[in-house]
Structures are given as structure tokens and as C-alpha cells.
């Protein structure tokens, strides 16, 4: 699974996932499923944010081509992917600036158009079950919840999906691709079932020595959102519109 993750995801996403696991004292060599899940969640958060801006009139627009228009403001503030100290600093700054209620748990994004924090979920199970788990944990009407599954299903607070259909379709397509690539490599069952994961871990550890000398193919393209992981007060400097960068898993 670890090899798959390093081949399938952008190196910057992998690096952020490694830092997150290290921060919580988790070993990615052992918790390989969690490593894959964190990378997937990070990518969905970045794809959610990519290309969405607010124009002078306060309208939400989607821009995919390079554009030096300095009057565009990023619609979403990315909180996920930062270390906890910086993440809470960003959240506090948003609350002080916008008057938003401070969430009990760290959210993933802040939507400047709808003036609300967003919790993104990616699940291998039924979307409604995961949604209820998130809602019961957060217990706040001020945090919007949006859940995606690997089967193309989604669920959001009050059926408000925030993004346009095309943007959501990109996310669903990416998740479906990840699932298919895992299945092609015999990893999907272990990703879904902890029991199968233990068996797969043993196989991975045995194969690592055999594959140690092999070259690894990775995509070097960087998601636009990864280039803008900085405090929200620097948002005014992030004026260039962004180019699409949807990563594909290399074939065996």
C-alpha cells in the first residue's frame, strides 16, 4: 500500500500526510491504510478548493486558466494540511475577522462566500452512516458537512453541496479512479477491511526488500491548492488563477 500511495499521489500531498502521521505518533510503515486515507482526504480538500474564486461583486466563479487578475479572492481557506498550531491560528483569525463561531474541532476549509466552516469526509462505507458519525461528533450547526464516497455517492448538510456539479464530478471521478487502481493491485479489500489489511501488510513488508532497488514513478504536477498553503492574511497575494492538475495513478 505504501508504494501505491507514493506512486498515486502528488509528492507534496505525501509529504503533508507523513508530517500529519508523525505529529500524532503514527508509523506509516504500519498504518499504511491510514496513510492512504490521509492522502486521499488531503487531495479531496485541495480539489474542493481549486479554481474557486470570489469576484469584485462577491459572486463565486470558477477559473481554470492562468489569469493575472488581482481582483479575485480565493473562495476557500484551506485549514487541512497545516500543523495543529498554525491551523488553530488560521481558524482564530477567521473567527476574529468574520465573526464566525469558533468550532470545537478543527475543520478542513472555510467558505468565504457562505461564511461557514466545512468538514470534508471521504468514506469507504455508506455515506449516510459516516455523515451521522461526523454530525454527532461535531454537534454544531455552524460547520457544514460534505461527505464523498468511493462509489460516487455524496451527502451534505441540508442537501447543500456548495460546489457546482462539474467540480464535484471531478472529485468523484478521482475517488473512483483511486478505488479502481487499488482494486487492480489487490489493495482495495485490505483498504476496506482491517482484517485484510493485516494480511496485506505482511505481503508489503516481504515485497519491500525485493522492490527496494526499483525506480518509482510519481506525478510531479502540483495541485494549485498546495501552492497556497499559507496563513489566510496572505490571501490577497494569491491572485493568479489556477491551472487544472488532476493526478492519475501510473499503471503497473
Curated annotation (Swiss-Prot):
Name the keywords, alphabetized. Decay of host mRNAs by virus, Eukaryotic host gene expression shutoff by virus, Host cytoplasm, Host gene expression shutoff by virus, Host mRNA suppression by virus, Host nucleus, Host-virus interaction
Q: In this chain's numbering, which residues are marked as the site (Important for efficient shutoff activity and nuclear localization)?
A: 195, 198-199
Q: Which Pfam families match?
A: Flu_PA
The Gene Ontology terms for molecular function here are: RNA binding
Active site location: 80, 108
Q: What is known of its domains?
A: The probable endonuclease active site in the N-terminus and the basic amino acid cluster in the C-terminus are important for the shutoff activity. The C-terminus acts as a nuclear localization signal. The C-terminus is recruited to host protein complexes involved in nuclear Pol II RNA processing.
Provide the function of this protein: Plays a major role in the shutoff of the host protein expression by cleaving mRNAs probably via an endonuclease activity. This host shutoff allows the virus to escape from the host antiviral response. Hijacks host RNA splicing machinery to selectively target host RNAs containing introns for destruction. This may explain the preferential degradation of RNAs that have undergone co- or post-transcriptional processing.
- Protein name listed in UniProt: Protein PA-X
**Protein's organism:** Influenza A virus (strain A/England/878/1969 H3N2)
